[in-house]
Amino acid sequence: MGYELFGLPMIYYISMVAKVLVVFVFVLLTVAYATYAERKIIGHMQVRLGPMRTGWHGLLQPIADGLKLFFKEEIVPSQADKFAFLIAPIIALVPAFIGFAVIPFGETIEVAGYKIPLQIAGYYDTVSGQVVDMNVGVLYILALASIGVYGIVLAGWSSNSKYSLLGGLRSSAQMISYELAAGLAIISVFMLSESLSLQKIVADQANGAWYCFKQPLAFILFFICSLAEINRTPFDLPEAETELVSGFCTEYSSMKYAMFFMAEYANMVTVCAVTTTLFLGGWHGPAFLPGWAWFIAKVYFLIFVCMWIRATYPRYRYDQLMRLGWKVFLPLTLVNIIVTGIVVSLQS
């Protein structure tokens, strides 16, 4: 472990590759089995069984679905912009995965004398000789949140279909409306932690001092606005089947369609991980489980809540969606910032 490459110890590169592989496999498996879990959970909530045929209680259903989509015919509409049509699913999928780069999923561990944070993104401090957390984690996530929608808009435009275009335009309008409220909702967290570092925000929530208790309104607003940003029910207007056939992905098939599907669920996992980090104490929990296990448990609980919401609430009408974002959520976030600022000023 004493070898160096480009002035950095080999342990830095080894740990980086290991963390990338672990996180990628975790997100991929979670996405695959979230589709299965959603069908089973909604099925039981509606007094049905859900998938039962493929494997024991349908446990192999995600594999069967993946194989089916992989071997289906790739169809590109004759009037479509082929290059944009093919690249749109990639633009939608990649930001959903790389958002995990800055999320800390456990406590710092020590290997061969080096302290390694359980977080992919970081830089090697040559003075201390340790991997240090970047102080821009939240800004990185907010920036990525607005990139995925470009893939959806591009898919709608390049398909040369009115239904796809309407779905893409709805997605962009929805993202603008709710990203503003979501960003303002977490300003109160910055005011309490006095940092943009996710490591620092998690550290401030130790011993049960979770920000969801100190900032319940911000927690609820951020979670709901995030669901609207990623087009989850009841905010799935961009792909409303009763109005737009299948919205922005109407003309897609095979693995291109699967990539949009994966992007939706990967975004859901990322939103739940960010919410866990900002409001639910991150990896903090009772000592009988390691920190990373608590982090995963909280993320899976929020994923279950997302599925519960889908099974419970009907889809909003488009004008109701816009009114809720601009006339209800945005003023509430501003009021919450003002009240938090007053409280912080009085305490200091």
UniProtKB/Swiss-Prot annotation:
Protein topology in the membrane: Multi-pass membrane protein
TM ranges: 11-31, 83-103, 136-156, 172-192, 208-228, 268-288, 289-309, 324-344
Key words of the record: Cell inner membrane, Cell membrane, Membrane, NAD, Quinone, Translocase, Transmembrane, Transmembrane helix, Ubiquinone
Keyword flag Repressor: no
Catalytic activity: a quinone + NADH + 5 H(+)(in) = a quinol + NAD(+) + 4 H(+)(out)
Pfam families: NADHdh
Enzyme Commission code: 7.1.1.-
UniProt GO molecular function: oxidoreductase activity, acting on NAD(P)H, quinone or similar compound as acceptor; quinone binding
Listed InterPro entries: NADH_UbQ_OxRdtase_su1/FPO, NADH_UbQ_OxRdtase_su1_CS
Top-level division of the source organism's lineage: Bacteria
Subcellular location: Cell inner membrane
Record-level GO cellular component terms: plasma membrane; respiratory chain complex I
Principal subcellular localisation of the protein: membrane
GO biological process: aerobic respiration
Function according to Swiss-Prot or TrEMBL: NDH-1 shuttles electrons from NADH, via FMN and iron-sulfur (Fe-S) centers, to quinones in the respiratory chain. The immediate electron acceptor for the enzyme in this species is believed to be ubiquinone. Couples the redox reaction to proton translocation (for every two electrons transferred, four hydrogen ions are translocated across the cytoplasmic membrane), and thus conserves the redox energy in a proton gradient. This subunit may bind ubiquinone.
Family designation: Belongs to the complex I subunit 1 family.
Quaternary assembly: NDH-1 is composed of 14 different subunits. Subunits NuoA, H, J, K, L, M, N constitute the membrane sector of the complex.
Protein name, entry field: NADH-quinone oxidoreductase subunit H 1
Naturally occurring in which organism (per UniProt): Geobacter sulfurreducens (strain ATCC 51573 / DSM 12127 / PCA)
Gene expressing this chain: nuoH1
